[in-house]
Amino acid sequence: MLNPSIDSLLKKIDSKYTLVTVAAKRAREMQLADDCAVEKPVSHKFVGKALEEIDAELLNYVPSEEKVSE
């Protein structure tokens, strides 16, 4: 079982694609600075820590207003 669960994460961020993108960007930041906002993370990997931050509502995103032309 994954912790945090995908269901609880999708309540915070509505799209799986956006969830992965936000978590990957935050994981990259943590690799460079080694700063995690979660007090005692369960995961030892950066992506897992980023997902825990999203689940704890310590990390969120603001959607872009820019629309991609088709």
Swiss-Prot record:
Catalytic activity: RNA(n) + a ribonucleoside 5'-triphosphate = RNA(n+1) + diphosphate
PANTHER family the UniProt entry points to: DNA-DIRECTED RNA POLYMERASE SUBUNIT OMEGA (PTHR34476:SF1)
Gene Ontology cellular-component annotations: DNA-directed RNA polymerase complex
Keywords assigned by UniProt, alphabetized: DNA-directed RNA polymerase, Nucleotidyltransferase, Transcription, Transferase
Assembly information from the UniProt record: The RNAP catalytic core consists of 2 alpha, 1 beta, 1 beta' and 1 omega subunit. When a sigma factor is associated with the core the holoenzyme is formed, which can initiate transcription.
BP terms from Gene Ontology: DNA-templated transcription
Pfam families: RNA_pol_Rpb6 (PF01192)
EC numbers, comma separated: 2.7.7.6
HAMAP family assigned: RNApol_bact_RpoZ
Cleavable signal peptide: none
Biological role stated in the UniProt entry: Promotes RNA polymerase assembly. Latches the N- and C-terminal regions of the beta' subunit thereby facilitating its interaction with the beta and alpha subunits.
EC class name: transferase
Annotated GO MF terms: DNA binding; DNA-directed RNA polymerase activity
Name assigned to this protein: DNA-directed RNA polymerase subunit omega
InterPro entries per UniProt: DNA-dir_RNA_pol_omega, Pol_omega/Rpo6/RPB6, RPB6/omega-like_sf
Keyword Repeat assigned: no
The keyword Ligase belongs to this UniProt entry's keyword annotation: no
Source species of the chain: Bacillus cytotoxicus (strain DSM 22905 / CIP 110041 / 391-98 / NVH 391-98)
Family membership: Belongs to the RNA polymerase subunit omega family.
